[in-house]
């Protein structure tokens, strides 16, 4: 068997998430169906580095799969790209070692979250940015977001019921920029891994801080007390993008 690593992007609006699930459309299943057709009906299993939720987009998701034969990477990329649905794009494909695993190989992820604070909202962006048409103090949020950098126990920012026991993660970058129009905000988070709904919960909290409904120091309190009830609401998924996955050499 020959193992391939692929970088893909997708519009998450019409998917129930990356991971295959019964009675719902998923990115994993669509790519597996295309690869199975290319493999003359023999089933191919796809593994993903990140399991994005329903409505979440990806600019640089990484997958791997095995084929029973070796094929030129560009020809394979072209075939997979052109035969996949329009809301999936295959950016690149490369041969990798047989023991490479896109999820378990050491890597870091970067996510971006886009907020549209325009009035009225732009209906063309409704699936690609979370609308928040309320007053926001950007400087307060920029101070608060830096408190998330470093190694912390992020229990207070994860969804209840998660099966992950170790909730300590390292965030190497947490930043917020505003575009030149002042309408769109982009939150960026890079780190060695993120808990279930962690980014959306952090953004929901930062928006509350920006709206003066929580103090800047609320971030410190949430990290100290590890209490989800102290954090803000979970931001909608439509503003979230898996931007990039970087593997260590």
UniProtKB/Swiss-Prot annotation:
E.C. designation(s): 5.4.99.12
Gene3D superfamilies: Pseudouridine synthase I, catalytic domain, C-terminal subdomain (3.30.70.660), Pseudouridine synthase I, catalytic domain, N-terminal subdomain (3.30.70.580)
InterPro entries in the record: PsdUridine_synth_cat_dom_sf (IPR020103), PsdUridine_synth_TruA (IPR001406), PsdUridine_synth_TruA_a/b_dom (IPR020097), PsdUridine_synth_TruA_C (IPR020095), TruA/RsuA/RluB/E/F_N (IPR020094)
Active site, per annotation: 53
SUPFAM superfamilies documented for this protein: Pseudouridine synthase
Protein's UniProt keywords contain tRNA processing: yes
Transmembrane stretches, start-end: none
Keywords from the named record: Isomerase, tRNA processing
Record carries keyword Isomerase: yes
A Pfam family that the UniProt record links to this protein: PseudoU_synth_1
Molecular-function GO term, any one: tRNA pseudouridine(38-40) synthase activity
Enzyme class: isomerase
Family: Belongs to the tRNA pseudouridine synthase TruA family.
Record-given protein name: tRNA pseudouridine synthase A
Record organism: Streptococcus pneumoniae serotype 4 (strain ATCC BAA-334 / TIGR4)
Gene, per the UniProt record: truA
